Swiss-Prot record:
InterPro entries (UniProt xref): AB_hydrolase_1 (IPR000073), AB_hydrolase_fold (IPR029058), AB_hydrolase_sf (IPR050266), Pyrimidine_utilisation_RutD (IPR019913)
General function of this protein: Involved in pyrimidine catabolism. May facilitate the hydrolysis of carbamate, a reaction that can also occur spontaneously.
Sorted UniProt keywords: Hydrolase
EC number: 3.5.1.-
Entry keyword Hydrolase: yes
Family of this protein: Belongs to the AB hydrolase superfamily. Hydrolase RutD family.
Gene that this sequence comes from: rutD
Single GO term (MF): hydrolase activity, acting on carbon-nitrogen (but not peptide) bonds, in linear amides
One of the GO BP terms on file: uracil catabolic process
Designated name of the protein: Putative carbamate hydrolase RutD
Organism: Escherichia coli O111:H- (strain 11128 / EHEC)
Pfam family, one: Abhydrolase_1
Protein's UniProt keywords contain Hydrolase: yes
């Protein structure tokens, strides 16, 4: 699996791995790259079955497989220890990495994540699946911003959204791969295992997230033994895109604090 690695800003700089959500594209993190690369060696990638890592995914594809293939790619790149920043599905992959490779994951940042899929989130995906079956890739892509962004933010950026729709349609991961990745997301359940995650965790959520209620992050915070929660009052599901200034400050402060906290505990 292909990874994109930024040059380390200094010798032995900590490594931060960015894991996007269901869309799978590493470019999702573009608003964070410049600030992160000043302090960390940053790893971005298109998830298997998407973008520049094309593949046909098995019907039983799972979050555990997503975690294993990423860890193997990191090891192959010479990376043994890394912090993880995961958004939604990416946060699930991050938790799986922390469970399966505890000696490697130094810190976990969960952005609009959850323990197991919420009834409201499931309902949103049911609607989106119906759109996919009835209207194909175009209907899925055109509906997606409604679940990602606040209405006023979208209304002020109509030309940008049209361009994003065209790009997403041109690079659509394919119906079968999308549904198999979505099914992996829906099957994931960390409610009985989260207390085994020992690395420090920062939880970031947006109170106006239409897709994943912020209560999911509260449940995650209660279940994780070493976690802190930060709530953004605005930004929607893709709060790192819509309000990068606020998000980046939380992310940078969280990474610095948790990495220091971990080193002090060693």
């Amino acid at each position: 699996m292909k990874l994109s690695l930024s040059p380390p800003p200094y010798a032995d700089a900590p490594v931060v791995v960015l894991i996007s959500g269901l869309g799978g594209s590493g470019s999702y993190w573009l608003p964070q790259l410049a600030v992160l690369e000043q302090e960390y060696q940053v790893v971005c990638y298109d998830q298997r079955g998407t973008g520049n890592n094309p593949d046909t995914l098995a019907e039983d594809y799972s979050i555990a497989q997503m975690a294993a293939e990423l860890h193997q790619a990191l090891v192959a790149a010479g990376i043994e220890h890394y912090a993880v920043v995961g958004h939604a599905l990416g946060a699930l992959v991050g938790m799986q990495l922390a469970l399966d490779y505890p000696a490697s994951v130094t810190v976990l940042i969960s952005v609009n994540g959850w323990l197991r899929i919420n009834a409201h989130t499931r309902r949103c995906f049911q609607v989106r699946e119906r759109l996919l079956y009835s209207g194909g890739a175009q209907a899925w892509v055109e509906a997606q911003p409604l679940f990602l962004y606040p209405a006023d933010w979208m209304a002020a950026r109509a030309p940008r959204l049209e361009a994003e729709d065209a790009l997403a349609l041109a690079h659509f991961q394919g119906k079968n791969n999308l549904l198999r990745r979505l099914n992996a997301l829906k099957r994931a359940d960390f409610s009985h295992h989260a207390d085994r995650i020992r690395c420090p965790v920062q939880i970031i959520c947006a109170s106006d997230d239409l897709l994943v209620p912020s209560a999911c992050s509260s449940e995650l915070h209660a279940a994780l033994p070493d976690s802190q929660k930060m709530v953004m009052p605005y930004g929607g599901h893709a709060c790192n895109v819509t309000d990068p200034e606020t998000f980046n400050a939380l992310l940078l402060n969280g990474l610095a604090s948790l990495l220091h906290h971990r080193e002090a505990a060693l």
